Amino acid sequence: MVTILIYLLILLIINVVLLLLGLIINKRSYSDREKNSPFECGFDPSIHTRAPFSMRFFLLAVIFLIFDVEIILLLPLTSNILNSNTHWPLTSSMIFLTILLIGLFHEWNQGSLDWMK
């Protein structure tokens, strides 16, 4: 128990020394603040530099990822269907595909898959 406390004390001392050494060596100046400020042809930028993000693109990308992951989940079912003597793998995969198709038709009816409106 005492050796663990000694190791913890040594680690604490090393951490404090490294922290203080970093604070002493660190040089912050006015030029660092200027380097981090926006610069555009000698003037501050008049508009926000970030481009607007299309929410329709984000929604389409999320839908694509969801269906992509679901297809990856379907791939092992093919070997289960071929190697099984029961109808359970086929039934479960049909239920899963039905749920996928219902979700796809719902997204289609909501207009989430239409890129241009």
From Swiss-Prot:
Q: Where are the transmembrane segments?
A: 4-24, 57-77, 88-108
Which is one Gene Ontology cellular component term of this protein? NADH dehydrogenase complex
User: EC class of this enzyme?
Assistant: translocase
Enzyme Commission number, as recorded: 7.1.1.2
Where is this chain's protein located in or outside the cell?
A: Mitochondrion membrane
Q: Keywords on this record?
A: Electron transport, Membrane, Mitochondrion, NAD, Respiratory chain, Translocase, Transmembrane, Transmembrane helix, Transport, Ubiquinone
The record's comment on protein family reads: Belongs to the complex I subunit 3 family.
- Which PANTHER family does the record associate with it? NADH-UBIQUINONE OXIDOREDUCTASE CHAIN 3
- Its predominant location is mitochondrion
Which is a Pfam family this sequence falls into? Oxidored_q4
Is the Thylakoid keyword given for this protein?
no
Tell me what reaction this enzyme catalyses: a ubiquinone + NADH + 5 H(+)(in) = a ubiquinol + NAD(+) + 4 H(+)(out)
Q: What species was this sequence derived from?
A: Heterololigo bleekeri
Q: What is this protein called?
A: NADH-ubiquinone oxidoreductase chain 3
Membrane topology category = Multi-pass membrane protein
**InterPro entries per UniProt:** NADH_UbQ/plastoQ_OxRdtase_su3, NDAH_ubi_oxred_su3_sf
Describe the task this protein carries out: Core subunit of the mitochondrial membrane respiratory chain NADH dehydrogenase (Complex I) that is believed to belong to the minimal assembly required for catalysis. Complex I functions in the transfer of electrons from NADH to the respiratory chain. The immediate electron acceptor for the enzyme is believed to be ubiquinone.
